[in-house]
Amino acid sequence: FKDDDGKIYCYFGGLWGGQLQWWRTLYHGFAPIPGKYGDDNGLIDLGPAPDHKTQLFAVPNAPAVPSNVVRMSDDVMQFAEAARPVIILDKDGEPLKAGDPHRFFEASWMHKYKGKYYFSYSTGDSHFLCYAIGDNPYGPFTYQGVILEPVVGWTTHHSIVEFKGQWYLFYHDCVPSNDITHLRSLKVQRLFYNEDGTIQKVINE
């Protein structure tokens, strides 16, 4: 994300067992500038959540369900607290079970829309991109539905951002790479909300 002082912060995971939780401070473009990394704790798919101007929340993946959320320090370069699990509830208020095809697997993302926090994620072997809504970054989040049906390339890693009043879904698909699953190509589609705040399902084109 880009802070008010013009710095650009990029968080990303690394290999299992090391080189994890990197950050870099950039002023112009994406030239490599040395950063540092945190504990070797097996985190992948790191991403900043909304409200970074007051408190930044990173949404890393734990080695197993569930995902975790943690508030960042004021300098946004380290964790300010212990990570907490992100709990996704069904419509009856019960946590999603491991056998549910819509449970969390990896690829955490969080964005904010009209005062609500949207936690979206990949379901792994069922290949859906799903989302849940909560009142704060810690949750709990209530499952809402599928954003994107399975694409070619196993899990769907994604991001949801707003640009000039329009929301967009970025994700990967392997069709442009002749269905070679480890050659993932970036795609983007416009994303729309219903009046009740739910997300309209995106059609992969």
Task: Place the predicted regions along the sequence by residue.
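Carbohydrate-active catalytic/glycan-binding domains of CAZyme proteins
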Residues: 1-205
